[in-house]
Amino acid sequence: MKFSLVATIVLLALAQGSFAQGAADLESLGQYFEEMKTKLIQDMTEIIRSQDLANQAQAFVEDKKTQLQPLVAQIQEQMKTVATNVEEQIRPLTANVQAHLQPQIDNFQKQMEAIIKKLTDQTMAIEN
């Protein structure tokens, strides 16, 4: 009877030890799953934040674009007015410059024609 009592105690001790080892494994497995859950939550939160940041940036750009459209239209209108004014001021100046240069251009053309005629006449005289 003592032997069976001792064998039972040893068997209980071994069983308790193996249960303790199983509990430790279970605890480490539970900790691993807890860490995985925490990492997954952090990753998903970061993805949602980055998506939210992209949406905020897009909304900001659209808002500023909407605000700037009237200003751009106003600047374009002012540029058209300035271009018209500059053209009106330059047109008489170009006409004036052309009027001053045209006699000189005509004179230059006559001189070049005279030189070419003289060279042609000299070439004809040499050939004969």
UniProtKB/Swiss-Prot annotation:
Location, primary (coarse class): secreted
GO cellular component: extracellular region
Chaperone among keywords: no
Positions of transmembrane segments: none
Signal peptide coordinates: 1-20
Alphabetized UniProt keyword annotations: Antifreeze protein, Pyrrolidone carboxylic acid, Secreted, Signal
Coiled-coil residues: none
Localization of this protein: Secreted
Entry superkingdom: Eukaryota
Function statement: Antifreeze proteins lower the blood freezing point.
Family from the record: Belongs to the apolipoprotein A1/A4/E family.
Protein name: Type-4 ice-structuring protein LS-12
Organism per entry: Myoxocephalus octodecemspinosus
